[in-house]
């Protein structure tokens, strides 16, 4: 017969193991790939839902079906400390309106179309002008950043698919266009964005994601100390209205040469004409590629935190924008005021104003065809 104190000790050990096992199971469950959703208000009489994507490493992405907007991305630094690295707001109301397009899916046509017009199959189309003489990010009314999409969480993955029908004539564009955007967060700390579209009439299509990143943490200051590499030997120079001239200019010998890692702020205020026109960087780079597959476009590194963002895409171009027009009038999360150059965008895309430049890669989607593109944001540290 065992002594009573020995039996008591065994019971305590068993209880401790049970409690520890439950705690471990709960912790593991918390860090499995998952999608959580909750009501986030209403817009235009339709419910808006917030989706939180979580992977096995504890990385989280918040997105909503209004505008396909990414509200937050929480990733660790080199010490394992998590921070939100995208500009944004804590409520739906902060995104209505959203002049800087913070976090949004932009379309039908991301970037600029000169003079708000293009000709297709012999017919001229007029679009709303919302950027001086130009149309920016699709116009003013039914642009993709201003509408409520249908949302459906993915099964067995940390992801969500948004779908939207852009009707014939919306913002002047032809064709009923069915659009699908899927966000998937992998256990490799990749946010994968898949874009798809079909149409019943020929129409231009150019879709992108307009998140503003600050790898030191949103609201912590400017991004001038970040170090950027762009896999691009050429860019598309612009005129005074930020419309491509049609030239594909070599970056070598210019402040737009990021073929080797370079501090964003080291040349941003040079007197080079393109920087003067853009008030900093706001240009499309021509990605070096050998085929149509996924290709590294950019790598950004923030030395204080050690965070790294790599952007790969199937698209031909990437717009690097340094938040030159953030002017302190936008107050974001935790009361942070977003001042000039407090965030950067890396917008994968077709070239700006392609419908008016037949020598650029075509953006015309025709009936019976499908537009598909993929962009991957990969987060790491060094």
Segments the model singles out, each with a brief description of its role:
Residues 10-21:
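Bacterial N-terminal signal peptides
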Residues 1-10:
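Bacterial N-terminal signal peptides that target proteins for export
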Residues 26-59, 65-382:
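An exposed, glycine/acidic-rich loop-and-rim segment of catalytic or binding clefts
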């Amino acid at each position: 017969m065992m002594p009573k104190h020995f039996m008591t000790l065994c019971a305590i050990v068993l209880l401790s193991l049970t409690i520890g096992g439950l705690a471990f199971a709960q912790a593991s469950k918390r860090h499995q790939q998952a999608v959580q959703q909750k009501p986030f208000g209403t817009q235009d009489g339709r419910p808006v839902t917030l989706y939180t994507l979580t992977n096995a490493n504890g990385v989280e992405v918040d997105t909503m079906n209004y505008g396909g907007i990414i509200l937050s991305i929480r990733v660790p630094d080199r010490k394992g400390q998590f921070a939100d690295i995208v500009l944004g707001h804590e409520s739906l109301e902060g995104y209505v309106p959203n002049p800087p397009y913070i976090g949004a899916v932009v379309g039908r046509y991301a970037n600029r179309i000169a003079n708000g017009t293009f000709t297709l199959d012999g017919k001229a189309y007029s679009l709303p002008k919302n950027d001086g003489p130009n149309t920016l990010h699709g116009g003013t009314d039914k642009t993709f950043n201003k509408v409520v999409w249908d949302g459906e969480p993915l099964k067995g993955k940390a992801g969500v698919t948004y779908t939207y029908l852009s009707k014939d004539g919306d913002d002047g564009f032809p064709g009923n266009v069915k659009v699908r955007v899927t966000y998937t967060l992998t256990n490799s700390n990749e946010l994968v964005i898949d874009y798809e579209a079909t149409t019943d009439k020929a129409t231009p299509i150019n879709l992108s994601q307009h998140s503003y990143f600050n790898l030191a943490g949103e609201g912590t200051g400017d991004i001038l100390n970040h170090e950027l590499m762009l896999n691009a030997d050429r860019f598309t120079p612009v005129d005074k209205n930020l419309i491509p001239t049609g030239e594909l200019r070599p970056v070598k010998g210019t402040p737009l040469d990021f073929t080797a890692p370079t501090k964003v702020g080291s040349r941003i205020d040079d007197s080079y004409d393109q920087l003067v026109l853009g008030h900093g960087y706001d240009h499309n780079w021509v990605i070096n590629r050998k085929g149509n597959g996924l290709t590294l476009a950019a790598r950004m590194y923030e030395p204080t935190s050690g965070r790294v963002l790599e952007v790969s895409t199937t698209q031909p171009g990437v717009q690097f924008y340094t938040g030159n027009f953030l002017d302190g009038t936008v107050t974001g999360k935790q009361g942070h005021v977003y001042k000039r150059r407090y965030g950067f965008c890396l917008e994968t895309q077709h070239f700006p104003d392609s419908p008016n430049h037949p020598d650029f890669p075509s953006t015309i989607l025709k009936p019976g065809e499908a537009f598909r593109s993929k962009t991957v944001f990969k987060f790491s540290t060094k």
